[in-house]
């Protein structure tokens, strides 16, 4: 959901947008894609109709994806900016697709720390590894920037004024419905 405001902005600015759907959450993706305004190309990298919620399903998705990444090259991606977000298997698959095809990997909300690689596995591994692969890392505070420096990332760290969650809240029309001084987080 956090990439949709970026997608809509790119479309509004007449950029060609290609959305790669990795297949981890096809049911959720179907509803989110409806929030995209304008023309874009939609590529289903792995076909599926049900959201994957088991480790066996995730392992199968990873194996199928790795074979496709290794044997199916996309020359049109070379030197293009390719945006990923999150700490799921889809994020890692997206990063592998981009790097295999020599695209420029952009990671939104980079540098979020974690309590230990094994305490929050595989999300912590994905967050760290995708940051190491990224050409551009978007952060919104100094703590995240410091974390990326500690991780010795090679990509360029870019600081933005606010977290992309604000754009996401606006997308689902919640920003104007919340009380400014009252927040509940679960």
Language model features with spans:
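A short, glycine/small-residue-rich beta-strand->loop->alpha-helix junction that serves as a flexible
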Residues: 1-5
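Conserved nucleotide-sugar phosphate-binding/catalytic loop shared by glycosyltransferases and other
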Residues: 12-65, 148
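A nucleotide-sugar donor-handling region in carbohydrate enzymes
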Residues: 22-27, 133-186
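Structural motif
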Residues: 79-81
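An aromatic- and histidine-rich active-site surface loop
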Residues: 83-101
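Active-site proximal beta-strand in glycosyltransferases
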Residues: 97-113
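A conserved, positively charged/aromatic
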Residues: 113-135
């Amino acid at each position: 959901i956090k990439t949709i405001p970026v997608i809509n902005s790119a479309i509004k600015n007449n950029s060609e947008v290609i959305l790669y759907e990795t297949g981890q959450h096809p049911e959720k993706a179907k509803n989110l894609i409806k929030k995209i305004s304008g023309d874009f190309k939609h590529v289903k990298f792995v076909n599926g109709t049900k959201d994957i919620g088991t480790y066996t399903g995730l392992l199968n998705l990873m194996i199928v994806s790795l074979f496709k990444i290794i044997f199916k090259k996309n020359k049109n991606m070379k030197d293009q900016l390719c945006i990923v977000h999150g700490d799921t298997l889809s994020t890692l698959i997206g990063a592998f697709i981009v790097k295999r095809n020599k695209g420029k990997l952009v990671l939104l909300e980079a540098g979020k720390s974690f309590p230990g690689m094994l305490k929050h596995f595989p999300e912590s591994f994905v967050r760290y590894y995708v940051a190491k692969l990224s050409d551009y890392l978007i952060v919104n505070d100094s703590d995240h920037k410091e974390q990326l420096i500690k991780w010795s990332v090679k990509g360029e760290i870019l600081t933005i004024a606010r977290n992309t969650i604000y754009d996401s809240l606006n997308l689902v029309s919640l920003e104007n419905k919340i009380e400014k001084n009252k927040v509940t987080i679960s």
